[in-house]
Structures are given as C-alpha cells and as structure tokens.
Regions:
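Extended, folded cores of ATP/NTP-driven motor/assembly subunits in large transport
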Residues: 1-180
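Residue-level detector of conserved catalytic or cofactor/ligand-binding positions
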Residues: 179-187
Length: 188
C-alpha cells in the first residue's frame, strides 16, 4: 500500500517532517509527545565535517549568485530594472551568507537532521485521523508533515531503534538551531 502499512492488528504510517521554519522548536516535539495516540518521533542527526560544510555553503552561494546574474540578464532583456530580483533569491542569498559567517566566526557546526513521525492505530480511519492531527501540530510550527509514499517499509525500519536511517530527506541545521531541541518527558 502506498501510504501506510499493516503489522499484526495495527495500521501504521510513517511521515517525514519538512522543516520550513528557520529553527526547530522543542515545543513542537513536546506537542507531538503530548498527543493522546500511538505516535513515535525519530530524530536522525548526522554531523558534517566543518570544512566540508563551509565548502558546501560557498558552492551554494556561488550558485545563488549565478542565478541572480541570470535573473538580472533576463530583466535587462525584458526592459525591467535589473535590481529587481525574485524575493526568494534575495532571501536565500542572505541566509546562506549569514550561515557561512556563523560557520566561520561563531564556532557553529553543521548537522543534517531527518525527523520521522510514526503513527499507529487500530483502524485505517483512526490512523488517518491521527496522521491528520500530527500534521496539524507540524503546521502550527511552520513545518509540513508528509507521508512517505511507497517508502513505508524504509520509514518503519528507520523508526525502530537500530540507529539506521534509510530515509535520506534531510535538513541542514547549525549547532544553535539544533540545540533548541530539548528532548524531555512529556507533560501530562
């Protein structure tokens, strides 16, 4: 089945968290843990070599600068002001330069994070409701929870405590962004 699995008498679905927000809030994790249903949250965190992270960010800045030049050329050909570039391009360029500065001067390190959410329920309907509830929690914190279509088995294997991540949908975070996550016992 495309977006769920069945194991014994339980139905399950694994989703990944697409982190759109610039930082990850530990309050979101607490909200997931406070949910009154069968939910398992998995964080796979991989450290990146410091020099490699700097090289990667420099390449990204070069790519963004190249895209900016192409946009400026298009604007000139179309008779527009060349200083007007798409806002996303300007935003990403600024963020990449800030990230490079942080890596070079603030002793920040770079990490890759995969955050998976496993929902379990007794019926398909209850599973769908619980996945919907988990997606609402993610949305509250400017994140998107997306089911792993056709990759439920890999998601399940990545959710059991073997330390193996078979889902390589990752988001780069710095030390300070990652340190905002305080794993603790949920409050009841």
């Amino acid at each position: 089945i495309r977006d769920r699995f069945q194991m014994g008498g339980k139905f399950g679905a694994v989703s990944f968290l697409q982190i759109v927000a610039p930082e990850l809030s530990d309050r979101m994790l607490a909200d997931f843990m406070d949910a009154e249903n069968g939910i398992i949250v998995n964080l796979h965190i991989q450290s990146i070599d410091h020099n490699e992270a700097i090289k990667t960010i420099k390449r990204k800045i070069t790519d963004l600068d190249r895209m900016k030049i192409e946009e400026q050329k298009k604007a000139i050909r179309s008779g527009y002001d060349m200083d007007i570039i798409p806002s996303d391009l300007a935003t990403y360029g600024g963020e990449a330069k800030n990230l490079l500065r942080d890596l070079q001067s603030r002793n920040e390190r770079m990490f890759l994070l995969t955050l998976l959410v496993l929902n379990l329920a007794d019926t398909k309907q209850k599973l769908d409701n619980e996945v919907f509830g988990a997606a609402a929690i993610a949305q509250k914190y400017n994140c998107i929870l997306t089911r792993l279509d056709y990759r439920q088995e890999q998601g399940l294997m990545s959710s059991i405590p073997l330390g193996e991540n078979l889902i390589h949908i990752q988001r780069g975070l710095t030390t300070s962004s990652l340190s905002l996550i305080h794993i603790s016992e949920p409050t009841r």
